[in-house]
Amino acid sequence: MSNEETKMRLNRRQMLGTTAFMAAAGAVGAGGALTLSGGTATPARAQETSGSSYEVKPGELDEYYVFFSSGQSGEIRIVGAPSMREMMRIPVFNRCSATGWGQTNESRKVMTEGLLPETVEFLKDQGGLYLNGDLHHPHPSFTDGTYDGRYLYANDKSNSRVCRIRLDVMKCDKIIQLPNQHTVHGLRVQKYPKTGYVFCNGEDAVPVPNDGKTMGDKNSYQAIFTAVDGETMEVAWQVMVDGNLDNVDADYQGKYCFATCYNSEEGFTLADMMASEQDWVVIFNLKRIEEAVAKGDYKEIGGVPVLDGRKGSPYTRYVPVPNSPHGINTAPDGIHVVANGKLSPTVTVFDVRKFDDLFDDKIQARDTVVAEPELGLGPLHTAYDGKGNAYTTLFIDSQVCKWNIEDAKRAYAGEKVDPIRHKLDVHYQPGHNHTSMGQTKEADGKWLISLNKFSKDRYLNVGPLKPENDQLIDISGDEMVLVHDNPTFAEPHDATIVHASKINPVHVWNRDDPFFADAVAQAKADNIDLMVDSEVIRDGNKVRVYMTSAAPAFGLDDFTVKQGDEVTVYVTNIDEVEDLTHGFCIVNYGINMEVAPQATASVTFKASRPGVYWYYCTWFCHAMHMEMKGRMLVEAQGA
């Protein structure tokens, strides 16, 4: 075995030892108040420290927006940093009682118009909607290597979807379901020249097409990598690959993206998935893929172009790395990319400048690797400070490791130098971590957030289900300083820290906004001015109720419909004062929706229950809030 192979390969005994250690750590850590942290059990209070101030005084504003995923809760959460105050939740894949997301016509259109035809058929007897989502990996759009404030994209692992949030109004305006692909795990966006593509990893292989006819034929199973056009929210192209895909990132030159693979064995069981001592990173050549699509060198499957990127393809290269790599993260220097080992104590550092030669077959795959430092047990994700330092989460060690990229390269070249600068205990078992602006060329090296999977003893006991623990860390000095614990509900998988200067939301809606354009068009057809008129339009057994709302009164004190009518209520908030949001709730009908200033919202339902049903404003918008109400009168059939 060559020295190069010795550097790279994870000894089978080491791998099994690491795996056993991980299992033991999970068993101890999940059950008790103590956790594995550098090999010692540390009480929570022993870790309290006073670092740089994270205090944001009353009336002052945070320096950063932090966009958190929520995993199985299905929403985006907006937190301010460094205060770590939660400011807003954006419902996306979930049903939201507060805002009516998933019930209003506007939100249902977003949630359904991008579904695959077979999914629409599948959901016909289930209300027409998926009622769950597993939202991971929120990432904003880029222009020239930094955030441009237009959009935020995220994936739904549970139902193979991708969403887009408009950052001017902080609302989801597009959701699409990916054909051919089964699950979406890693998601990142094109950094240069702009977004551009949204890259989506297919984690699990299934037969393509997945119609139940070839389930026993392993050769029919394929994992799929997808590029979505971030402007049109349509699939631009897909690439079939060998092995499962995990996480993904892109370069700063607009030439390549790259994904980790943790199941090169293409196994169906845990033992099968861990059988090999090596997996790989897949590198995608965007120019070659685009040229092939333009020339028609693809198969159309599920209505989209699909290219064959399996081993030997001109579109991809496979670089061997130690077993089960997880995160892959591009450094702000535009040169280095780090794949994190997970089952190996190492991370693998690539130099993107070598990728051209790799695709031109001038060098071997492992020649793109320039460092492979050993950092600790369970490296999952790496963040950067823009000063040449990297910060890697060590899941099993419950630590964040600060290390220097150039020193790691020197050590890989044979020099006796230790790249590790500092290790900090975190609480407990960290997954993702992110630095302020650290995923852009403008990394500022101020803050790091460690998203920890277990909180254990850090908070008052709230029962068997515990919060996660997101910890704010000051990285402005030579050593990291833990300054704040922040509990979060299930379950953030990722976060992005964006300087507030990059985001510029509106305070009130623009009346020309496309979000409620369908309501405007219907009102025009009914000769209704939404900003003025409050009227009832009957069209057979379909009734359209239009009303304005201006605190503290709705435009209609009551309206009458017949039992069995299909009723659509349109409410337009004509208040122009910022933060004067109204709500519209019909008692005992299960109807509630948000109506923000200058917005129109609508909801459609069947008036199946006769009688008197009051509607009222659910937002406290006025001193006469309790009086802001009216009656829906439902005439009984035959009355």
UniProtKB/Swiss-Prot annotation:
Predicted to be exported by the Tat system. The position of the signal peptide cleavage has not been experimentally proven. Cu cation Z2 binds at residues 136, 185. Cu cation Z1 binds at residues 326, 381. Keywords: Calcium, Copper, Metal-binding, Oxidoreductase, Periplasm, Plasmid, Signal. Ca(2+) 1 binds at residues 453, 468. It is found in: Periplasm. GO terms for biological process: denitrification pathway. Binds 2 calcium ions per subunit. Cu cation Z3 binds at residues 137, 432. Belongs to the NosZ family. In the C-terminal section; belongs to the cytochrome c oxidase subunit 2 family. This is Nitrous-oxide reductase. The lineage of its organism: Bacteria, Pseudomonadati, Pseudomonadota, Alphaproteobacteria, Hyphomicrobiales. The gene is nosZ.
